[in-house]
Design a protein with these regions (language model features):
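Conserved "HGTGT" condensation-loop signature of ketosynthase/thiolase-family condensing enzymes
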Residues: 1-124, 130-217, 227-230, 234-237
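Short glycine/threonine-rich catalytic loop with a Thr-x-Gly-x-Asp
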Residues: 224
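Short, intrinsically disordered, charge-balanced linker/junction segments flanking boundaries
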Residues: 242-244
Length: 244
């Protein structure tokens, strides 16, 4: 008989509770990502000086590039390659969720996906017989946060926390952004990609995802980044790039 042990059914918190919205925001129904990220997108459009129509073309072309990556990713949730026109055109199967985002510009969290990472010392990896050419080393890490209340942020068209964290993680690794071969930006909505690219100094027309992103690759809630890391680790192992 297995020696089953009874564990406490109450989860142990690993961080403090975070209040995400002010009463004034809630009163205006600004509480969920589908209401918040469209505000960021509108700010980015205004700063760029684009018309609504031109900006829809711009962000749909961005997401078409993500869809093209997903079409070649064997682990992607949606392998159909969408055109920019299909992504921006509102239809019965691509309804408007929160202007300016139709469904195909929103994170797809209705998925059944999982990913895992194994972290260990080099000594342990050697003892387990993992070939040396399969080892992937994390070089550095950093953590920063924008203000939880969006009404307290100075602007909606930039993300100082990402800029600071990105600069610091590169400093710790002794690299520049141009030294990074493989990039996967968080992509719950097009504005997240634009903000991340701008803050990190990345070309918006470059390949900014290795999975296809949260809409096409799949957006399993707060576990997406693990999928991105696992995908990049696999590509590093296969020699697609040296850094990611």
């Amino acid at each position: 008989t297995p020696d089953w042990r009874t564990t406490d059914t109450t989860p142990t918190p690993v961080s403090e509770d975070l209040t995400m919205n002010m009463p004034e925001e809630l009163a205006r129904k600004i509480m969920m990502p589908i209401q918040i990220y469209p505000l960021f997108e509108t700010a980015l459009r205004a700063q760029a000086g684009r018309s609504v129509a031109d900006h829809q073309v711009y962000i749909s072309e961005l997401y078409a590039r993500f869809s093209a990556v997903a079409a070649t990713n064997p682990n992607a949730w949606s392998k159909k390659q969408y055109t920019a026109e299909e992504i921006r055109t509102v239809s019965d199967t691509n309804r408007m969720i929160g202007f300016p985002y139709p469904k195909l510009m929103n994170s797809n969290n209705d998925v059944d996906m999982s990913a895992a990472l194994i972290l260990c010392s080099a000594e342990k990896a050697a003892a387990l017989g993992v070939p040396r050419d399969r080892w992937i080393f994390p070089q550095s890490g950093s953590d920063a946060h924008e203000h939880a209340f969006i009404s307290h942020r100075n602007h909606f068209y930039d993300t100082p926390a990402i800029e600071l964290a990105g600069r610091r993680v590169l400093e710790l690794a002794g690299l520049s952004i141009n030294d990074i071969d493989l990039v996967d930006l968080y992509s719950c909505f097009p504005s997240a990609v634009q903000l991340g690219a701008k803050s990190l100094g990345l070309d918006i027309n470059g390949q900014l995802t290795r999975t296809g992103g949260l809409q096409f690759g799949g957006g399993p809630w707060n576990n997406y980044v693990m999928h991105a890391i696992a995908t990049v680790a696999g590509e590093l192992r296969s020699g697609v790039g040296a850094t990611g």
